[in-house]
Amino acid sequence: MKKHLFPLFLLLIGANASAQQDFFALVGKETPNIVFNDFRAIDGLNGVSGETIFTSDSSAKVFSQNRNSSVTEDKNTFSNAQAINIATLAYDPSSNNLVYMPMFSSNIYVLNAKTKEITLVENDIVRVTSCDINSHITRMATGYDGNIYAINNSGTQFLQISKKGNQYVVNDLGIIKDDLDNAKNSFTALETGFGGDMIADAENNFYVFSASGNVFKISTKELKAKFVGKISGITENYSVNGAAVNSQGKVVVASAKGAALYEVDLKNLQSKKLAGEQNLHIYDLASKYFANDRMTSGNALANLDIYPTRVDEHYINVNVNDKSVKGKLTMTVFDLSGKSIMKQNLSVRDGSLNQQVYLKNLVNGAYLINITDESGKALLNKKILVTE
């Protein structure tokens, strides 16, 4: 893995970040079968449930992007926004959307966590049949590039869900194959590699946590799955069905069978049980965080922010409404290597600023915006994604 030389503030930010909804669970009913109950916020540090976002009994407002109209779905089918067999979940923080798929359907759903409006993305790329366990989409996560990724059980489909303008686009990136050194710990075998969930790291690699507890690193360039090891410290016969990175950079895993959540250190795969709820049936987890990420967002002031964080028109807005902020500010844009690639001076008058900043010559990708005051104190550090 590449070693980046980051400015000191990148190692320290995040300590003052306020609590927010950034970690979510797909929760089932108390039954041995997969039966969808709700999407909910959850505390990724202690395993305690928060606000319920959407349930199996909620009124579903579904808009089909293909048909450009609202649709009424048949709840008795496998292809609806509240199907009983949902097993994948990802979180897109740039739009506050939860993205998910029913396990036996090619439909992709995008649920806005605030408005509860749902966009249906129909497509002919996903090849799923209910009777073929190899084809079931069971792992999903947001990549560091801002796109959503999903993998079926056998690795024969590696899906990318991206947004072009106002439309979601689905692509199949190809077949993921076993690394030659995997031996008996095969990514493509039911007993060792199927099911579970996936997370992303800061270099847009992925880690699949299979139901067996085996962990595989997925190289997106080579489309290979390399066996990393097996989680230690979880109870015997624990089924790993959800995985997501928390705000401390640890991986939280959960089980569909009704069990405690565990926090896993990706460096050594050692786990410890979280003290929260001990019998949640969790089919998938999702968060805004990434493994090995030194660019975690932080904001020292509640009334200083930038928007949008997904930039598709080459500019951002800087907004200040805080009497304690005075004089000149410096906004610096860093790339993923920690290199300063752009600077802009900002002037605050009477604690107020609302300025549009043009991001010239920035190619698509992730960047960090750092804003400091005249003394050099960091007031804001926030990641943005530049897209077309």
Predicted segment positions?
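Bacterial Sec-dependent N-terminal signal peptides
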Residues: M1-F23, T309, V333, L379, ...
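Beta-propeller fold detector
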Residues: V48-N76, I118-T129, Y168-K184, K224-G233, ...
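Residue-level detector of functionally pivotal "anchor" positions at catalytic/ligand-binding pockets or at interdomain
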Residues: K288-E313
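Conserved beta-propeller blade signature
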Residues: Q21-G28, N97-M101, N147-I151, N205-F209, ...
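C-terminal outer-membrane/trafficking sorting elements
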Residues: D305-Y307, D312-E388
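Blade-level signature of beta-propeller repeat domains, shared across WD40, Kelch, NHL, RCC1
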Residues: A254-T296
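An edge-strand/N-cap motif at the start of beta-rich repeat modules
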Residues: A19-T52
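Repeated scaffold domains used in trafficking and secretory/extracellular systems
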Residues: V62-Q65, K75, S79-A90, R127-A141, ...
